[in-house]
């Protein structure tokens, strides 16, 4: 959508890149509401760049060039992706966030999980503090042959190198 790839370069370099891409330019000029999902994975640096790009391309000094913005995500889940061991700053710590976001909402009702015990385990995991009972429930699942299940599990890895190995 944005036409900036990984967002490397200065705001001006990215603006120049977008101006050469008719489709991306149309996105920036015709969008009234910009929705960014999984905002927890975006760095403060990239969010600030998007804000600057919006202002320049739309010739409007309001946040994001006057677009409304809706950020969706859970900062307890996935942090920004770190490159080369560099720790990055969360999007909510950016200048763009301070400038643009005036209201935060928290959704508190779990819609996709009906198992109350599993909900409790997920809440503990989200907060980084599993009880002994939750650990026992999880450990009881160890050794089960997940390949027998008709629903294949999502595989999660803590390191990019492990993800790259699986994706090869």
Task: Please state what every model-predicted region is.
Residues 1-168:
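Conserved ATP-binding/catalytic motifs of P-loop helicase motor domains
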